[in-house]
């Protein structure tokens, strides 16, 4: 592992689940079914450790609003208890390529949103995933928030390198 590797959060272990080594995870990944696939490598970062702990996903299932994961070689609650509160991360090299028009959350958060007329709306601070399409929460300069749906009719251009997004606001969107 390269010392200068960039790491990306994919989840937070908030508790154990049952007695067979499952952990309850609040997912922070755009692609949980891909990221938590059996056989995938994840890295556990605990505050007091200097090096991450590499684990291999043994199983993944969704229960209520949590992702439940188990790892190879960690078969009881006693094995995973110490992971409570830890972050699950992957190195940048593990992110993989996306199709055109798809972006990782970290590429969108922090982008400046501008209308096609050149008016600056604000910066994306959060991404909501309520259903059919993502919704970007944009912090305006006056501190208020605008909700921008990630749909073709509204989002005209995304430039992650320049950290800019150009939109065509629908009537009433920015009021």
Curated annotation (Swiss-Prot):
Keywords: Chaperone, Cytoplasm, Ribosome biogenesis, rRNA processing. InterPro entries: PRC-brl_dom, PRC_barrel-like_sf, RimM, RimM_N, RimM_N_sf, Transl_B-barrel_sf. Its main location: cytoplasm. One of its GO terms (biological process) is ribosomal small subunit biogenesis. One of its GO terms (cellular component) is cytoplasm. GO terms for molecular function: ribosome binding. Residues 100-173 form the PRC barrel domain. It is found in: Cytoplasm. The PRC barrel domain binds ribosomal protein uS19. Belongs to the RimM family. Binds ribosomal protein uS19. An accessory protein needed during the final step in the assembly of 30S ribosomal subunit, possibly for assembly of the head region. Essential for efficient processing of 16S rRNA. May be needed both before and after RbfA during the maturation of 16S rRNA. It has affinity for free ribosomal 30S subunits but not for 70S ribosomes. This is Ribosome maturation factor RimM. The lineage of its organism: Bacteria, Bacillati, Bacillota, Bacilli, Bacillales.
């Amino acid at each position: 592992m390269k010392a200068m590797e960039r790491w990306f959060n994919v989840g937070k272990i908030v508790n154990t689940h049952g007695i067979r080594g499952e952990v309850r995870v609040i997912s922070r990944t755009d692609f949980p079914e891909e990221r938590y696939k059996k056989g995938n490598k994840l890295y556990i970062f605990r505050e007091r450790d200097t090096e991450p702990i590499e684990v291999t996903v043994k199983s993944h299932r969704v229960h209520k609003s949590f992702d439940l994961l188990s790892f190879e070689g960690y078969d009881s609650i006693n094995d995973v208890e110490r992971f409570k509160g830890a972050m699950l991360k992957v190195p940048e090299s593990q992110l993989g390529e996306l199709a055109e028009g798809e972006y990782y959350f970290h590429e969108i958060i922090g982008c400046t949103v501008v209308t096609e007329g050149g008016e600056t709306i604000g910066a994306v601070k959060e991404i909501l995933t309520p259903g059919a399409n993502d919704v970007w929460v944009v912090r305006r300069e006056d501190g208020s928030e605008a909700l921008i749906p990630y749909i073709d009719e509204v989002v005209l251009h995304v430039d992650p390198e320049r950290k800019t997004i150009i939109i065509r606001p629908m009537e009433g969107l920015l009021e």
